[in-house]
């Protein structure tokens, strides 16, 4: 699961062509493999066609755009966090690219990346402690029920309530990486996409 951004009017290099879609039911594995190779090459040659991030990588990038891009409306900011197919114009894409480019060139960019890595490391250490508590609680549930395969939803009520409280202590910062490399790739896409949709 993730976020797929498609260029509306991407710049296409001369001589570049998109492979025709295959009939998956009638194609051999070799034909499918070749199709993916050609599709990947087409997207690499034409960076404005497609940009993808898994949900974990997209959230920090979209948050950065929302934080820095005062020119975006609340609606535009909101739809960055949704894959409903909202469209952003070419002018908007270029403004976002300019804003992110200025950020990347600033000392703040490296600091942001380093601070995010520290926060992830701290959250990861915290989550290990939370997971240890959950593991201990699981042993209690097994001892009471004599069911070594018991899932938390089937714990006795008092243990299930305790599991819910402990699980809520997880710090999800550990799950959302931020990398300047990703920001730079997004800038390339924005400059070449001719406007984009978020799906």
List the predicted regions and their residue ranges.
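Acidic (Asp/Glu-rich) sequence patches and key acidic residues
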Residues: 1-199
């Amino acid at each position: 699961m993730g976020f797929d951004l498609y260029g509306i009017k991407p710049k296409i290099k001369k001589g570049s062509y998109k492979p025709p879609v295959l009939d998956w039911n009638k194609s051999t594995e070799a034909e499918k493999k070749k199709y993916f190779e050609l599709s990947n090459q087409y997207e690499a040659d034409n960076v404005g066609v497609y940009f993808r991030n898994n949900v974990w990588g997209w959230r920090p990038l979209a948050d950065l755009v929302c934080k820095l891009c005062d020119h975006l409306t609340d609606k535009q900011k909101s739809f960055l966090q949704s894959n409903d197919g909202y469209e952003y114009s070419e002018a908007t894409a270029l403004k976002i690219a300019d804003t992110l480019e200025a950020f990347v060139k600033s000392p703040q960019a490296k600091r942001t990346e380093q601070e995010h890595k520290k926060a992830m490391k701290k959250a990861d250490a915290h989550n290990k402690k939370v997971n240890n508590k959950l593991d201990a609680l699981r042993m209690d549930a097994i001892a009471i029920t004599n069911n070594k395969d018991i899932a938390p939803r089937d714990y006795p009520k008092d243990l299930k309530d305790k599991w819910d409280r402990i699980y809520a202590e997880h710090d999800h910062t550990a799950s959302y990486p931020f990398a300047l490399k990703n920001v730079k790739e997004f800038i390339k896409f924005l400059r070449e996409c001719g406007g984009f949709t978020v799906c």
